[in-house]
């Protein structure tokens, strides 16, 4: 099949999926259709949509990363091994982060700390865990740099996040405050946050973040990666762009983890914006001096 035909086919598939998704969401958001959080159940075992969304996001990101390996001095077998350890570190980081900001509860029920199947993972913790593992792994391997791996990682991470966020959709969680906007999302009574029992429709913040993540992915993967002049640009821009979107979206959510009187995700987002901006400014300054 020629390149032009592949592009046309891809556009047709994307349009078909988009149209189908629009009508599906219209039914769910109106409350005429209630989704369940699992695909099937055998005894006490449930195959949950949340797990499928997370796994699908990782798989798609991995496939796209493999396609870009020619741009990086990283061996395919080391990408595979690094992915495994990155997933382990990401899960641990996501859980540790969540437990820290819910310590009042977990200090009373320490046996719940390891029971991640009861819920409780935070994306910022997952990112920090994965980045720490990338740093350690790059030092162990020695032949590629930390920024080589982080650029490859952050070029596909937004798409994995965009897909993973749909797990929140099936769980009716991570939604925002009540709203009357046309795209408001119906939440069943049993899934509503305490104090919002009489409210029926809420901001679909999972969708906001998913769309924002897709936008970041398209920008980084198809534009920045092909035009960057220095390793580290993709990583710095990811930190800035994701954090800007997350800061705003977090202001709408009802289930934010708190750091004292502040939303933890917003505090972390501000820090990451400054780190990303300083990093990007350093890279631009470095390339500018080199050109001169």
Curated annotation (Swiss-Prot):
EC identifiers of the protein: 2.5.1.145
Record-linked InterPro entries: Lgt (IPR001640)
Protein topology in the membrane: Multi-pass membrane protein
Pathway, per record: Protein modification; lipoprotein biosynthesis (diacylglyceryl transfer)
Example GO biological process: lipoprotein biosynthetic process
Transmembrane segments: 7-27, 45-65, 83-103, 116-136, 204-224, 264-284
Matching PROSITE patterns: LGT
UniProt entry keywords in alphabetical sequence: Cell inner membrane, Cell membrane, Membrane, Transferase, Transmembrane, Transmembrane helix
Primary residence: membrane
Pfam families in the cross-refs: LGT
Localisation per UniProt entry: Cell inner membrane
Presence of keyword Transmembrane: yes
Keyword Transcription: no
Function per UniProt: Catalyzes the transfer of the diacylglyceryl group from phosphatidylglycerol to the sulfhydryl group of the N-terminal cysteine of a prolipoprotein, the first step in the formation of mature lipoproteins.
Protein family: Belongs to the Lgt family.
Identification of the protein by name: Phosphatidylglycerol--prolipoprotein diacylglyceryl transferase
Gene name as annotated: lgt
């Amino acid at each position: 099949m020629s390149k032009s035909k592949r592009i046309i086919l891809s556009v047709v598939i994307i349009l078909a999926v988009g149209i189908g998704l629009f009508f599906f969401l219209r039914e769910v958001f109106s409350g005429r259709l209630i989704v369940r959080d699992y695909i099937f159940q055998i005894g006490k075992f449930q195959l949950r949509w949340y797990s499928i969304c997370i796994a699908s996001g990782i798989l798609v990101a991995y496939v796209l990363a493999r396609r870009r390996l020619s741009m990086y001095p990283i061996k395919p077998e080391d990408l595979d091994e690094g992915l495994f350890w990155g997933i382990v570190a990401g899960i641990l980081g996501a859980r540790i982060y969540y437990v820290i900001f819910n310590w009042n509860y977990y200090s009373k029920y320490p046996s719940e700390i390891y029971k991640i199947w009861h819920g409780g993972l935070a994306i910022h913790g997952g990112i920090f865990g994965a980045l720490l593992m990338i740093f350690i792994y790059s030092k162990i391997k020695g032949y590629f740099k930390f920024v080589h791996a982080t650029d490859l990682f952050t070029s596909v991470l937004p798409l994995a996040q965009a897909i993973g966020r749909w797990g929140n959709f099936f769980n009716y969680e991570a939604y925002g405050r009540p709203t009357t906007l046309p795209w408001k999302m119906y939440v069943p009574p049993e899934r509503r946050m305490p104090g919002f029992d009489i409210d029926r429709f809420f901001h679909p913040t999972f969708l906001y973040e998913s769309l924002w993540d897709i936008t970041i992915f398209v920008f980084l993967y198809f534009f920045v990666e092909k035009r960057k002049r220095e390793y580290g640009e993709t990583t710095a821009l990811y930190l800035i762009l994701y954090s800007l979107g997350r800061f705003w979206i977090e202001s709408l959510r009802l289930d934010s983890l708190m750091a004292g009187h502040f939303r933890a995700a917003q505090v972390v987002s501000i820090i990451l914006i400054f780190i990303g901006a300083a990093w990007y400014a350093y890279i631009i300054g470095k390339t500018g001096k080199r050109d001169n």
